[in-house]
């Protein structure tokens, strides 16, 4: 026996039923759909229609809204930054900005800038220029000897 002579056992693969191909097939004429009515027509299902019962999408309450003023920050964790520094993709000498993070492959798209979060540990002293940072991230960066400059944030005195 050769590989090109292999074949299935008889009846191992059942052919699919081709409906509407003559009455002798047992599934001809109406094709197993019965006679007349909504369900016998093509494009039968009406999405969400439950036979007159109040459909689920109308039974459940409306919820929430999309805030058009919400800021869409790209999130970067300190652990990832430390890994990039150790891999040689980030230098600690110059300030770390959005462009530097994008070049290092840590950020893809950032509509409203980058937000720094404290997951992981940072041992290198780095200066960050970012749009936002969590209090824990600022504390961790300053503990490592670095600094966080929040760009675009109004100083407290100017906010009055």
UniProtKB/Swiss-Prot annotation:
GO terms for cellular component: cytosolic large ribosomal subunit. Part of the 50S ribosomal subunit. It comes from Rhodospirillum centenum (strain ATCC 51521 / SW). The keyword Transmembrane does not apply. NCBIfam families: rplO_bact. It holds the Pfam family Ribosomal_L27A. This is Large ribosomal subunit protein uL15. Residues 1-52 are annotated as: Disordered. Residues 1-18 have a biased composition (Basic and acidic residues). Coiled coil: none annotated. Binds to the 23S rRNA. Residues 21-35 have a biased composition (Gly residues). GO terms for molecular function: rRNA binding; structural constituent of ribosome. InterPro entries: Ribosomal_uL15, Ribosomal_uL15/eL18, Ribosomal_uL15/eL18_sf, Ribosomal_uL15_bac-type, Ribosomal_uL15_CS. Keywords: Ribonucleoprotein, Ribosomal protein, RNA-binding, rRNA-binding. GO terms for biological process: translation. Belongs to the universal ribosomal protein uL15 family.
